[in-house]
Amino acid sequence: MKYKYWLACMAQMAENIGTGKVEKLFRFAGSAGVLYDMSEKEFMQIPGITEADVKSVLTYKKAWNLEEAWENLKRSGLYLVTREDENYPKRLLYINKPPYGIFYK
């Protein structure tokens, strides 16, 4: 789940990366964990992802302490639901560029 958290946050905070590109990245990798572990060379093979996008993803990944952020989220009492989860609001799947993840309390 922590990799889904990373992906949901990246969709909102990483430069040049939004919901549409997160969708492309996720479809290519098949899971947030696989995506997190991908190399620069692997990212460059994703159709529709530019060199600037790859740089943004890798910069965000390097600058963000995932373990610390994940522990902070768990302590905060907030929860995350992503598109792959059963309890993701089904109606959101029908809008243009639905959010990858939603935080709730």
Map each language-model feature to its residues.
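Short, positively charged patches
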Residues: M1-K105
